[in-house]
Amino acid sequence: MEYEDMFPYSFGLSVLRRKTAFDEMTTKQLKESANAIGLNIIPLIQTFGHFEFALKHQEFSSLREDPNWMDTICPSNERSIWLIREMISQIRHLHHDEKSIHIGCDEAYHIGLDKACQLRLNTTLNGSIDRLKLEHISRVARMAKEEFGFEQVLVWYDILTWLGQGIFPDGLFERFSQVFDNIYFAGAFKGADGISQQFVHIERYMQTLRSYQKLYHQNEKYLKDRLTGIILTGWQRYSHTTPLCELLPAGIPSLARQAISVSQWMNKKEERTDQFMQEFLNCSVRHSTSATKFVHKGFTFPFVFEFKFSDCQFPGVELYSEIEELNLLRWKAAIERYISNIETENETQNELEKMEEEFRKLRKTIASLLGHFFYEDTVDEWLAQHGHLNRFNDDDLGLPRPNRL
């Protein structure tokens, strides 16, 4: 769980908390709820990149690797190490029995720019950015293990892809198998299909998962006893300063689909995945919706598979259903706009005006449902972000491009 500014930081770190941050009691309740269904919460703390939530504050702005960017912390500033240590300490206080921690380290784009880093590069590191990165990661990992007792430290792989060939032998999984006892794959069930995407396309996310299965079989020699598991991520933003993307209720069927697929793969079982998924989500057989609902002006709705889970019974299904209705409506509106470019505009304009009223009704319903799952500031942000529900990008709908020549 990446808390970011939702963690109940205190004392010298209290400025990191947002107004609606969890308190200690809520954090403990989250842990207890997870434990009750056989899950452990592995805290994820950013220790290199994605540090905007801290570096945006004046108190810590001097720790930026580049003063013009607040995403990357300077690894050569001892106050940076103090900040990271204090964050891990407070995380450990509320996760006192957790064996693992994730120290992030993805997307640290500005490295080796601060004067302190430049000094190290020109003296002890022989100009090697790779060594600068590795020394910081290993220092933080040792801190988490030796000072705070975490047995396992996880780190994202992408920062290691930039390392020179002299650090590890050639061959990705071959070299990793010589260094790491445990390797995880990490896909996404939501939050990776567009910076402001609101509609979860299950098949697109499944393609990544299938590619991992293929990758495993191609490299089974090196991964057989080291692939420890698969992390199914569900991001809510691309970064601290970007808009909200797909909401969690909208991603539940995608999560279920991937979890079932991973379970079958890891346990080497072949089952009827779609049927199992519908049983898992407590779905009823859809009789009430005619197939004509998904056909408009000769076009067929491309996301019928996602829509059918609106009849299921899982936490958040009410919001999921309205989001899917919104997806269907904006698809029909996109078709009307497409047709208006190649036919007479009067007829299609009348259709669009009728749809405008449907968009307004949907927005009102969604606004009411959002309050059941999110804090008020998140609801306000989503509504401000989508002031008009008929303003989504149509590129993901698969419509042909009109010839306007």
Report each predicted region and the residues it spans.
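Substrate-binding groove of N-acetylhexosamine-processing glycoside hydrolases
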Residues: 32, 81-89, 93, 99-100, ...
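Feature activates predominantly on carbohydrate-active enzymes
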Residues: 1-146, 155
